[in-house]
Amino acid sequence: MSKLNPYFGDFGGQFVPQILIPALEQLEAAFIAAQQDPEFQQEFQDLLKNYAGRPTALTLCRNLTKGTKTRLYLKREDLLHGGAHKTNQVLGQALLAKRMGKNEIIAETGAGQHGVATALTCALLNMKCRIYMGAKDVERQSPNVFRMRLMGAEVIPVHSGSATLKDACNEALRDWSGSYDKAHYLLGTAAGPHPYPTMVREFQRMIGEEAKSQILAREGRLPDAVLACVGGGSNAIGMFAEFIPETSVRLIGIEPAGLGIETGKHGAPLKHGKLGIYFGMKSPMMQTDEGQIEESYSISAGLDFPSVGPQHAYLNSIGRADYVSITDDEALEAFKTLSREEGIIPALESSHALAYALKMIHQAPDKEQLLIVNLSGRGDKDIFTVHDILKSRGEI
């Protein structure tokens, strides 16, 4: 059986307790076989099309770019069933779990979007489902918690550590190490131990594949840049993968600058972290001077992750992709702008990517540029957060 490379340059690997190695090897073998199995691919494609609603639209912004020479398109992953790009790869991994004869799913979630995608998929495929979620996130994402429970998932709040995504990840891995014979750990992003970063990329790459053929059909040329927000990095790698060989296309990943990089309250390990080993992989991460994992911070729960997927670390190291950061306030502004100008309410995560695109547009209004922003999710889950912030500022 051929093996996949566990590394992207110096990044990635498989740093897990010995007890989990057989489970990861089984997963890699099943993934390789499934990728070459027309029956598996057909079932996956059928679910993507007839259950999740692919292909998603590529929408030209009519009003945001008025008075400029930019054409800005949004790849509408917010229209996918479940409300975000997460559903794509969850369907893929769940089918893989069934193929391995496993009928229980363990998952972690931050914003709750991965949890919702996992819950709906498990309901559809008749699988048992337990989802670990930081107690803080349970509080700030109550609509998604109810959605998960409504669809039959067990949601387990995690109170240890900072009670956010990284702690939920730790608990999920702990659970899996005692139950991997019957349970599959359905990791929610393109990070973690090999083969997850590769597998999640492949189960998300239709985002970029569709966007590429859609933009060629609409504009007759490739975009000048594609932009996506980066937490763990699955929506971004799904958008970037197809464009990596197209060297004329700039790849721009947007990390959360939170309250400002200088405050230390951010989630931008690619540009402001140090190389370390965490969550089963070697990648840049936010660390204290003693080398402990530092708490990340972002207004958006889905970007509140102290590390980043290894392929992004690699693309950054070779200069193929540029990584920048956007603050909470800039993301909020973009959230309001898209809602008011185009009638589309974006997730706060996606608002980071949009905010950087708006910066590019306003810095060079006379520059003819063709941009695609991956609108990775819809903002329904964030309206209470945004409402409370705007109310406290006297804006509503």
Curated annotation (Swiss-Prot):
Classification via CDD domains: Trp-synth_B
UniProtKB keywords: Amino-acid biosynthesis, Aromatic amino acid biosynthesis, Lyase, Pyridoxal phosphate, Tryptophan biosynthesis
Top-level taxon in the UniProt lineage: Bacteria
This enzyme's EC code(s): 4.2.1.20
Modified residues (N6-(pyridoxal phosphate)lysine): 86
Catalytic activity of the protein: (1S,2R)-1-C-(indol-3-yl)glycerol 3-phosphate + L-serine = D-glyceraldehyde 3-phosphate + L-tryptophan + H2O
InterPro entries: Trp_synth_b_CS, Trp_synth_beta, Trp_synth_beta/beta-like, TrpB-like_PALP, TrpB-like_PALP_sf
Pfam families reported for this sequence: PALP
GO cellular component terms, A-Z: cytoplasm
Gene3D superfamilies: 3.40.50.1100
Pathway this chain belongs to: Amino-acid biosynthesis; L-tryptophan biosynthesis; L-tryptophan from chorismate: step 5/5
Cofactor(s) needed: pyridoxal 5'-phosphate
Molecular-function GO terms, alphabetical: tryptophan synthase activity
Assembly information from the UniProt record: Tetramer of two alpha and two beta chains.
UniProt family annotation: Belongs to the TrpB family.
Function comment: The beta subunit is responsible for the synthesis of L-tryptophan from indole and L-serine.
Protein name: Tryptophan synthase beta chain
Organism: Photorhabdus laumondii subsp. laumondii (strain DSM 15139 / CIP 105565 / TT01)
Top-level taxonomy: Bacteria, Pseudomonadati, Pseudomonadota, Gammaproteobacteria, Enterobacterales
Gene this protein is translated from: trpB
